[in-house]
């Protein structure tokens, strides 16, 4: 893509960028088994030995076993069963992620059991790691003083997928719970509500996390303005996403997208008082042109306006509010290799 970026309406950078390139292999064997491998060439591994012993660039390395018509087991590095359309949809369809989805541990090694109740209802029961590297990689500024690393860095997730109105209405809801550090846990509630019936595709996502220590680093980064940063304890994040796609014609698609996000400290301590520290909203407009029928080749023009508002509590650390704009003219293509 050709990207032109601005900060506070002043030119920041104009450059060509390859936002996403991936190698993907998938297939099956012996009728009941499947495999899926995917490596991103835009991701960089952590300097320390990863928890799962895999390069951070490997997003998927999993094998599925269809036990019967109802049950399927999946083992290996796989998507965490978070919900929300933006989180779950193929990443090549997303031009700009919310801060929430850009910082969650979405691909982890673990085990998933899927139960298909019928054609309209499916449940997933999953246990995975909650991080790829060690704790030093997970927390941007290290653990707070007196907090010890966890010996059980796992995340348990329960998910429900429901389909209604001839599969036009798609609901996906998940609950997740795990341990970030000793006596410091994390809880996620994520949900996606989708309407997909041509020529419209619309969705509303709600994402919430409550964290004993700030694993996303979005609040903690305000402390690093005047020196070394500090990982903030007892934070929560809330994000809501609205998107509406309209297929104008067989070769044209347009969408508008809006995101609102909030980051809070829910319990005061010696350094941080409780309350809201950041509010973020962004608006996106995109036009997509498909020059070929039945092809994933598309050209797009994407406009982004993002406002990061830091409250007085955050500004007391020296951080400042700002806004960001970006214009992108790009190309997306899935190249099949047999």
Regions found by a protein language model. Give the residues of each.
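Outer-membrane beta-barrel pore domains
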Residues: 7-12, 50-51, 165-338
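Loop-centered beta-sheet repeat module
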Residues: 126, 130-187
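Hydrophobic, lipid-facing positions within transmembrane beta-strands of outer-membrane proteins
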Residues: 19-23, 56-63, 107-111, 154-158, ...
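Glycine- and other small-residue-rich loops at beta-strand/loop junctions that grip anionic moieties
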Residues: 102, 149, 233
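Short aromatic-enriched loop/helix-cap "lid" or pocket-rim segments at secondary-structure transitions
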Residues: 86-88, 137-138, 216
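Short C-terminal domain-edge/linker segments immediately following a structured domain
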Residues: 28-31, 103-109, 144-145, 202-209, ...
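Low-complexity, polar-biased intrinsically disordered regions enriched in Pro/Ser/Thr/Gly
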Residues: 47-50, 139-146, 315
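Outer membrane beta-barrel
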Residues: 1-3, 11-133, 162-165
């Amino acid at each position: 893509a050709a990207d032109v970026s601005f900060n506070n309406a002043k030119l920041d950078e104009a450059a060509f960028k390859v936002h996403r390139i991936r190698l993907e292999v998938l297939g099956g064997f012996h009728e009941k088994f499947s495999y899926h491998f995917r490596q991103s060439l835009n991701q960089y591994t952590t300097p320390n030995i990863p928890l799962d012993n895999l390069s951070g660039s490997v997003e998927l390395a999993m094998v599925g076993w269809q036990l019967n018509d109802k049950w399927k087991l999946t083992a290996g590095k796989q998507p965490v069963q978070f919900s929300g359309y933006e989180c779950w949809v193929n990443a090549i369809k997303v031009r700009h992620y919310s801060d929430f989805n850009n910082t969650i541990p979405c691909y982890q090694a673990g085990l998933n059991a899927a139960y298909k109740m019928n054609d309209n209802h499916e449940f997933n029961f999953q246990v995975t790691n909650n991080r790829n590297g060690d704790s030093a990689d997970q927390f941007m500024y290290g653990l707070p003083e007196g907090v010890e690393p966890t010996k059980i860095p796992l995340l348990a997730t329960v998910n429900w997928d429901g389909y209604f109105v001839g599969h036009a209405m798609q609901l996906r809801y998940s609950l997740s719970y795990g341990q970030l550090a000793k006596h410091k846990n994390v809880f996620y509630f994520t949900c996606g509500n989708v309407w997909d019936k041509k020529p419209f595709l619309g969705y509303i996502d709600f994402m919430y996390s409550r964290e004993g220590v700030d694993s996303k680093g979005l609040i903690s980064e305000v402390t690093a303005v005047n020196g070394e940063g500090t990982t903030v304890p007892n934070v929560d994040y809330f994000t809501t996403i609205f998107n509406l796609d309209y297929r104008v014609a067989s070769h044209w698609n347009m969408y508008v997208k809006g995101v609102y996000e909030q980051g809070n400290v829910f319990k005061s301590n010696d350094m941080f008082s409780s309350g809201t520290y950041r509010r973020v909203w962004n608006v996106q407009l995109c036009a997509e042109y498909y020059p070929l029928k039945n092809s994933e080749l598309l050209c797009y023009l994407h406009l982004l306006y993002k406002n990061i508002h830091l409250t007085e509590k955050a500004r007391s650390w020296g951080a400042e509010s700002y806004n960001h704009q970006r214009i992108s003219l790009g190309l997306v293509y899935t190249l099949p290799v047999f």
